């Protein structure tokens, strides 16, 4: 099988040296992502496209899906590469490929040509289009807005029959811009802002301020791992978790109620800046949107920025909540965010929307900054790829099984779309579907006399959810890994 990768248009308008660098980085990213599917896979870069060739036909859909999620790719063409002799040969091959697709449909033919030939692109379009129209009685030509567009590419003595076109996410390849540190909470905003910086070519590391205990951190780990695995797995990134409960306790005790929200955000920026400096990261990323909550007025954002020299990027600053939720739905983080607990809002009952710098600084004079230094020093820093391994260690009390007994039921916790695309069928045992994001509210409704074997494709989500359910007091859960 063969795929032709078309570059994001902004890459093609760069200078020659920058364009070549971007293409080289994108080629490396594609190799890093796809090597898990086919070790014999070949990735070849050209001036205006990248070729991907693979032998394992069983991995075709997985490879195609992975390519659509790599930043820097505008669209992917799945092609059949065959030799040809003349225009009539091109027509015959096009007829064999597209006959079934065109029956009862309107169509047009579009040809791109490279190399020296005795015919032009328009001549091929007319010849092939006329031939298809004659040989498929139920089809008819329509040059504007047809049901089907027959795409052909001619390069020297090779014909590329385009079997399908699939849109990528665009943007710049990860690694073409400098690293950033995303302040991730697991909600709608931070997930979308992290994705937007990945799409713009940044390697995004994650910093999580834990205000709600182990269950909250597990949920945020899921979001960070999902974003990395889906859009940024070409690069290694860090997940830094800081236990911020001592800081919150100090704020509740020492800071005036109305100033708590701004002071908390200033403490977070101070801590994140220390982490960024430690790892040589150039900027922080937040999901703040202007006026969304009390701490996100211009006055308060300016006061928050003042505590650090580190650049703070806010890609969602002008977005409304509905737009952000729609983006979260598109990238697949909406369901995570809907079930994520929100802790920041409970810290202040009557927050100020226009904090005064002198008053904020006066309140902070009462704060014991050694507490902040201590929690940063004790921050838990892991390679995001190790989250699965760490989860396996943490869920040591949750048994992992490869078989099943008479009282066991397999619980497929994949998302609804994944279940529809690839239903799980196991002989000799019942399989029940319950997406991971409904476990917290719906697992208790299941028959608790049964033993539930949690299953997902890679085993990461099933381990995380098993730990969560154990913490909630459910002892009848195991992890199923056949």
From Swiss-Prot:
Catalytic residues (UniProt): 456 (cysteine persulfide intermediate)
Pathway where it operates: Cofactor biosynthesis; thiamine diphosphate biosynthesis
Positions of disulphide bridges: 344-456
Reactions this protein catalyses: [ThiI sulfur-carrier protein]-S-sulfanyl-L-cysteine + a uridine in tRNA + 2 reduced [2Fe-2S]-[ferredoxin] + ATP + H(+) = [ThiI sulfur-carrier protein]-L-cysteine + a 4-thiouridine in tRNA + 2 oxidized [2Fe-2S]-[ferredoxin] + AMP + diphosphate; [ThiS sulfur-carrier protein]-C-terminal Gly-Gly-AMP + S-sulfanyl-L-cysteinyl-[cysteine desulfurase] + AH2 = [ThiS sulfur-carrier protein]-C-terminal-Gly-aminoethanethioate + L-cysteinyl-[cysteine desulfurase] + A + AMP + 2 H(+)
GO molecular function terms noted in the UniProt entry: ATP binding; CCA tRNA nucleotidyltransferase activity; tRNA binding; tRNA-uracil-4 sulfurtransferase activity
Primary localization: cytoplasm
Gene name linked to the record: thiI
Function: Catalyzes the ATP-dependent transfer of a sulfur to tRNA to produce 4-thiouridine in position 8 of tRNAs, which functions as a near-UV photosensor. Also catalyzes the transfer of sulfur to the sulfur carrier protein ThiS, forming ThiS-thiocarboxylate. This is a step in the synthesis of thiazole, in the thiamine biosynthesis pathway. The sulfur is donated as persulfide by IscS.
Domain Rhodanese: 404-482
Gene3D superfamilies, per database record: 3.30.2130.30, HUPs, Rhodanese-like domain
Cellular compartments annotated: Cytoplasm
Keyword set includes Magnesium: no
Protein name, as recorded: tRNA sulfurtransferase
UniProt record similarity statement: Belongs to the ThiI family.
Binding of ATP, residues: 183-184, 265, 287, 296
One annotated Gene Ontology cellular component of this protein: cytosol
InterPro entries: Rhodanese-like_dom (IPR001763), Rhodanese-like_dom_sf (IPR036873), Rossmann-like_a/b/a_fold (IPR014729), ThiI_AANH (IPR020536), ThiI_fer (IPR054173), ThiI_N (IPR049961), THII_Thiazole_biosynth_dom (IPR026340), THUMP_dom (IPR004114)
Statement: the UniProt record of this protein carries the keyword Nucleotide-binding: yes
Coiled coil: none
Domain THUMP: 61-165
SMART domains: THUMP
């Amino acid at each position: 099988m063969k795929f032709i990768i078309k570059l994001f248009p902004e890459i093609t308008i760069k200078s020659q040296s920058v364009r070549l660098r971007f293409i080289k980085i994108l080629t490396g990213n594609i190799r890093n992502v796809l090597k898990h599917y086919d070790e014999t896979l070949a990735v070849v870069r050209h001036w205006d496209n990248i070729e991907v060739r693979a032998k394992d036909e069983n991995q075709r859909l997985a490879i195609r899906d992975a390519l659509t999620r790599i930043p820097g790719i505008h669209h992917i063409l799945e092609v059949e590469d065959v030799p040809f002799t003349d225009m009539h040969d091109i027509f015959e091959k096009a007829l064999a490929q597209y006959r079934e697709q065109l029956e009862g449909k309107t169509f047009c033919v579009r040809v791109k040509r490279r190399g020296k030939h005795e015919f032009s692109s328009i001549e091929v379009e007319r010849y092939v289009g006329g031939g298809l129209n004659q040989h498929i009685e139920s089809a008819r030509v329509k040059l504007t807005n047809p049901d089907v567009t027959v795409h052909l590419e001619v390069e020297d003595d090779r014909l590329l029959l385009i079997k399908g076109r699939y849109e990528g996410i665009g943007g710049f390849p990860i690694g073409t811009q400098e690293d950033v540190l995303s302040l991730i909470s697991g909600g709608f905003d931070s997930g979308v802002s992290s994705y937007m910086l990945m799409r713009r070519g940044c390697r995004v590391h994650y910093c999580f301020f834990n205000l709600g205990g182990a269950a909250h951190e597990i949920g945020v780990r899921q979001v960070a791992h999902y974003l990395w695995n889906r859009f940024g797995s070409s690069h290694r990134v860090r997940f830094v978790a800081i236990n911020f409960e001592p800081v919150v306790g100090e704020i509740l005790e020492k800071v005036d109620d109305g100033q708590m929200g701004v002071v908390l955000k200033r403490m977070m920026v101070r801590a994140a800046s220390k982490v960024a400096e430690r790892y040589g990261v150039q900027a922080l990323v937040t999901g703040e949107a202007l006026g969304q909550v009390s701490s996100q007025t211009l006055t308060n954002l300016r006061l928050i920025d003042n505590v650090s020299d580190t650049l703070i990027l806010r890609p969602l600053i002008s977005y409304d909540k509905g737009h952000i939720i729609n983006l979260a739905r598109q990238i697949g983080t909406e369901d995570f965010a809907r079930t994520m607990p929100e802790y920041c809002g409970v810290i202040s009952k009557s927050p100020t929307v226009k904090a005064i710098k002198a008053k904020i600084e006066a309140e902070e004079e009462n704060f014991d900054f050694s507490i902040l230094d201590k929690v940063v020093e004790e921050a838990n820093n892991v390679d995001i790829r190790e989250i699965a391994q760490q989860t396996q260690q943490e869920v040591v009390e949750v048994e992992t099984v490869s078989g099943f007994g008479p009282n066991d039921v397999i619980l497929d916790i994949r998302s609804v779309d994944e279940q529809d695309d690839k239903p799980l069928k196991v002989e000799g045992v019942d399989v029940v579907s319950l997406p991971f994001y409904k476990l917290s509210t719906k697992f208790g409704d299941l028959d608790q006399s049964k033993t539930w074997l949690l299953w997902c494709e890679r085993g990461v989500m099933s381990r995380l959810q098993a730990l969560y359910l154990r913490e909630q007091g459910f002892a009848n859960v195991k992890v199923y890994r056949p």
